[in-house]
Each structure stands twice: as structure tokens, then as C-alpha cells.
Amino acid sequence: MATAKPILYGAWISSCSHRVRIALNLKGVDYEYKAVNPRTDPDYEKINPIKYIPALVDGDFVLSDSLAIMLYLEDKYPQHPLVPKDIKTKGLDLQIANIVCSSIQPLQGYGVIGLHEGRLSPDESLEVVQRYIDKGFRAIEKLLDGCDSKYCVGDEVHLGDVCLAPQIHAAINRFQIDMTKYPILSRLHDAYMKIPAFQAALPQNQPDAPSAK
């Protein structure tokens, strides 16, 4: 009996969904993608009570939070390891991933931007988001000072790269960040855009993207 494909609930524009798509692609997992708007779809709460995306349904197991999903995938699918074996390299890689997941992305999301509605103009809201992104990018740029490897912590893609790539993409395409301030991150972005697994995961390449309709 064939095993059912895992189902990824997400949205084209979500950088959290974007990073999980990259991880699934890198590991060669055949999955089903279901687009969802967690703010308007009442049924999604049955899958994820906190109503954030993404969520992964793997048989009778449901998991939400992109970092938890990627670590689950890492354990279930050993091909193309995303977590380095060396403990210091692993520590740096996880630090980069967590800066993105904890200190940048949550502060640019709809939940936070929505708090500004009525109090700040769109331009003022954008400036707030840009400050958060710039703060995180400055930190990562310093952490990677002197980095001469192909990717964040080596010549293979790891978890930090998987988290960083969507954040840089959003910074450029949604939040008008001047990437000339971040030469290392700009170089990494160029490297990511050459990888088929990253290209396939891009927001504009998803079936729910406006460009796909």
C-alpha cells in the first residue's frame, strides 16, 4: 500500500512556508502543497489551533512551526543533511537560523504590521519593518565576517541557508532593503538563486501566487 504524501499547508508569500519548501525540495520529498489563508479559512484552525502557517500533515501526525517542521524532516529524511555534525559549526548555523526565525521574521509579519494600522502610515510601517530586518542582517553579516565558504557555514547548504534565503528574498522584493550594505548576504543570495531546489521554492513559482493565475 502506497504511503500518503505529506501535505504542506502554506502560502506563496509566507517566508516561513518558503523555507519549508526549500527543505522539502533539498531532501527530494514528494509532497502535496495546499494553499491556505489562515486569517480567513475557519477550517485551518482544526489543523493548527494557533492558525499560523506553515503546517505539515504527515499521515496522522500534524506539526506546525517552520523550524520544528524542518528538524522533523531532518530526522525523517537523512538525505542532504541540513544540520552540521561539528558542534561549533552547528552552533553558528543554528544561531543564524534562529536570528531569522525569532528576531527578524516575526517582527515583519502581518500580526505585527497589523498593530500599526491606524497609527502609522504605510510608509511609516515599512520603516519599522526595515529597522527590524536591518538589525538582524547587520548581526548575521558580522557573524559571517571573513566567511569565504560557498554558503553560510560551509560548501554545502545547511539550515541557516534555508532560513536566510527566503528572508533575503523578502527583504529585496517586499521590504525594499538596500542589500549593498550586506556584501556577504548579497553573495549568498546570488549562490542560492543558482540552486534548483531554491528556485522551485520561490514565492512567484507557487500555484497560489498571483502570477500563476
Swiss-Prot record:
Any one Gene Ontology molecular-function term assigned to this protein's record: glutathione transferase activity
Catalytic activity from the UniProt record: RX + glutathione = an S-substituted glutathione + a halide anion + H(+)
Residue ranges constituting the GST C-terminal domain according to the UniProt record: 86-211
SUPFAM superfamilies: GST C-terminal domain-like, Thioredoxin-like
The protein's Enzyme Commission number: 2.5.1.18
Alphabetically ordered keywords of this record: Cytoplasm, Transferase
Compartment(s) of residence: Cytoplasm
GO biological process, alphabetically ordered: glutathione metabolic process; L-phenylalanine catabolic process
Coarse class of the protein's main subcellular location: cytoplasm
Boundaries of every GST N-terminal domain copy: 4-81
Domain of life assignment: Eukaryota
Annotated Gene Ontology cellular component terms: cytoplasm
Family annotation (Gene3D superfamilies): 1.20.1050.10, Glutaredoxin
One Pfam family linked to the record: GST_N_3
Alphabetized InterPro entries for the sequence: Glutathione-S-Trfase_C-like, Glutathione-S-Trfase_C_sf, Glutathione_S-Trfase, Glutathione_S-Trfase_N, GST_Zeta, GST_Zeta_C, GST_Zeta_N, Thioredoxin-like_sf
Enzyme class label: transferase
Function according to Swiss-Prot or TrEMBL: Has a glutathione transferase activity with ethacrynic acid and nitrophenyl acetate. Has low glutathione peroxidase activity with cumene hydroperoxide.
Family label: Belongs to the GST superfamily. Zeta family.
Protein name: Glutathione S-transferase
Source species of the chain: Triticum aestivum (Wheat)
Record lineage: Eukaryota, Viridiplantae, Streptophyta, Embryophyta, Tracheophyta
